[in-house]
Design a protein with these regions (language model features):
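N-terminal export and membrane-targeting signals
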Residues: 1-16
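Noncatalytic scaffold domains of N-terminal-nucleophile
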Residues: 32-58, 62, 70-235, 240-241, ...
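Extended C-terminal subregions enriched in glycine
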Residues: 422, 473-475, 507, 516-560
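Internal maturation/activation junctions in enzymes
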Residues: 269, 321-431, 445
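C-terminal region of N-terminal signal peptides and the immediate post-cleavage residues
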Residues: 20-37
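Short beta-strand scaffold segments in enzyme catalytic cores
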Residues: 89-90, 94-101, 414-418, 482-484, ...
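Alpha-helical support elements that line or immediately flank enzyme active sites
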Residues: 63-64, 151-159, 235-242, 247, ...
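Active-site rim segments in enzyme catalytic domains, especially the processed small/beta chain
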Residues: 83-109, 126, 259-272, 424-493, ...
Length: 596
């Protein structure tokens, strides 16, 4: 294990350190990493990058400045997030990549979702007739799906990039070697996972040096991750799917490196070498709806993001939100979200394994039938029943309720957005599912494995024909919603967010804020959020207006923080506006190649 945090003061000589103790604070030595200021908004030209992390944004911008395009920058930034935001993303996970090609005017998507091993059966998360406790399922080899992120990068660069994988990984490798300055968010996430990280020798050695999380202000280096990136640069991603890394991943899944004295039953996983060798990141058709004259593109199954955001937008388009006032606009947003989530839960899964009525879910006729259930006077009783996307729409309004579903989809994940001087745009959401994934670091490789398979429903939630039960080679349903909006065939904006199933409502609310309520994109991102996912109560951040909505019958529960979005808008002036969070998750980082 070659990954250690180092206090900034430790790089100084003892004399300098002694002087620092009695005088001014110590500055880092020349060449040592320094905490980078995060700017949540940047306006300019030549290209733009927005991520949650200043290092990742910097690396992406460097690629653009050297002549790379939006795809090159997206891969480089994502690889850097695997170093600086390792509890949310990395090569042990997966994601969804949405790309607008300025040369053709077309939108393409890559499905890099993690996949169930061939040995996984429908009852994989059931023991003695009872579902495995969720937290125990997460922290196990059983939860680990075949990673898709490395192949996503490879496919993206091969299809649309201009640089090699090795070139794309260079900046991230340097960050891993040089280190980054630990902030409070990193410390908090480590501390929240410390108990389960301590259960695995490889994880505790990397992330709990001396048995404790790294301190704020220390420099965290991950030389194992750098060496792993070097291996991928030299041998290509097949080193992970068919080469030396494959066996190491399978060993970690089948025989997790459990620390002595651990009392948790850490279940082994089912992954075999053949599962890695047969994995494919897939090019899929994007979802597409028209909203207020704009074309909105998203990710299709196995993500439910594009279909659910798209259905909700279709429902909202039946109402002139800009003319009815804030309370009614938010009321309709919450109701449309609940209706779309009911349909998501009932119908959406991996379309290679189940029949998903995607065209009907995104049809105007179905939206009109669902919209007629919304009353401006009172909130629907939640949870609402799913509709019938059968092509026979007579605007007959339903009113039935259904059983509530537990939502245990992990709130981790990260989203980045890039654009280049040619007008190409990427919206890319990637994840290892829960914060810290499965908790298992592949020994001496510097990265965590995902727990993506806990995104399957453990048992049937739909009274038959549940679309999201485990199956061999199946991809669990996702909520990731990378979204690109075109106006007249040209990019207007791109946006996405982490946050489990709240991703869908975060993206939907930002779109409504920007396109209907007249907010500029920075304000649309920063505005207080609420999420209604067909549950009895609405989870809302502080500052979200509740009183008048409560008078309509909406019930509220507190949620301190929902999502952590990034986006880019193409302004009328011809400039780019890159936007990240000003506060959530410690704030994000937006940058442009040439500031205005």
């Amino acid at each position: 294990m070659r990954s250690t945090p180092v206090r900034l003061s430790a790089v100084l000589g003892s004399g300098a350190l002694t002087m620092a103790l009695v005088a001014a604070p110590v500055s880092p030595a020349a060449g040592a990493p320094r905490a980078t200021e995060k700017d949540p908004v940047a306006v300019g030209s030549g290209g733009a990058v927005a991520t949650v992390d200043a290092e990742a944004t910097r690396v992406g911008l460097e690629v653009l400045r050297k002549g790379g395009n939006a795809v090159d920058a997206a891969v480089a930034a994502a690889a850097t997030l695997g170093v600086t935001e390792p509890y949310s993303a990395g090569i042990g996970g997966g994601g969804f990549f949405v790309y607008y090609d300025a040369a053709t005017g077309e939108v393409h998507t890559i499905d890099g979702r993690e996949t169930a091993p061939q040995a996984m059966q429908e009852d994989a998360f059931v023991e003695n007739g009872t579902p495995i406790p969720f937290n125990d399922a997460v922290t196990s080899g059983l939860s680990v799906g075949v990673p898709g992120t490395p192949q996503t990068w490879d496919v993206a660069l091969d299809q649309w990039g201009t640089i090699s994988l090795g070139e794309a990984l260079h900046g991230a490798t340097q960050v891993a070697l040089r280190g980054f300055v630990v902030d409070q968010t990193f410390v908090d996430q480590t501390a929240a996972n410390a108990a389960r990280f301590a259960e695995f020798t490889s994880t505790s050695e990397l992330y709990l040096p001396g048995g404790q999380p790294p301190a704020v202000g220390t420099v965290f280096r991950n030389r194992d991750m750098a060496a792993t990136y070097d291996l991928l640069a030299e041998q290509g991603v097949q080193a992970l799917y068919n080469g030396p890394l494959a066996q190491e991943i399978v060993d970690a899944v089948q025989e997790p490196p459990i620390a002595p004295g651990v009392t948790r039953l850490v279940r082994p996983g089912l992954m075999e070498l053949g599962d890695l060798a047969s994995y494919e990141a897939l090019l899929r058709e994007p979802t597409a709806v028209t909203y207020r004259g704009l074309d909105v593109f998203g990710m299709g199954p196995p993500s439910s993001g594009g279909s659910t955001v798209g259905e909700a937008l279709n429902i909202l388009e039946t109402v002139p939100l800009a003319e009815i006032g804030e309370t009614q606009a938010l009321h309709h947003y919450l109701e449309a979200s609940a209706l779309a989530f009911a349909d998501r839960n009932r119908y959406v899964g991996d379309s290679d394994h189940v029949a998903v009525p995607l065209d009907e879910l995104l049809s105007d006729g179905f939206a009109a039938e669902r919209a007629c259930e919304i009353s401006p006077l009172t909130a629907l009783t939640k949870p609402v029943a799913p509709g019938s996307p059968d092509g026979d729409y007579d605007a007959t309004c339903g009113s039935a309720t259904s059983a509530a579903l537990a939502d245990e989809e992990g709130l981790s994940t990260t989203h980045l957005t890039t654009a280049d001087r040619f007008g190409n745009v990427v919206a890319y959401t990637l994840t290892i599912e829960s914060t810290g994934g499965s908790g298992i670091v592949v020994p001496d490789r510097g990265f965590l494995l995902n727990n993506e398979l806990t995104d399957f429903n453990f048992t049937d939630t739909q009274g038959g024909n549940d679309p999201n039960l485990p199956a061999p080679g199946k991809r669990p349903r996702s909520s990731m919603s990378p979204t690109i909006v075109l106006e007249g065939g040209e990019p207007l904006l791109a946006v996405g967010s982490p946050g489990g199933s709240t991703i869908i409502t975060t993206v939907l609310q930002i779109l409504m804020n920007r396109l209907d309520l007249g907010m500029e994109l920075p304000d649309a991102v920063a505005a207080p959020r609420a999420t209604q996912r067909n549950t009895a109560s609405v989870q809302a951040e502080p500052g979200f207006p509740r009183a008048e909505l409560a008078a309509l019958g909406h019930l509220f529960a507190n949620n301190p923080e929902i999502g952590a979005a990034t986006g880019i808008e193409f302004l009328d002036s011809g400039l780019l506006q890159a936007v990240a969070e000003p506060q959530r998750r410690g704030g994000g980082s937006a940058g442009v190649v040439i500031p205005s």
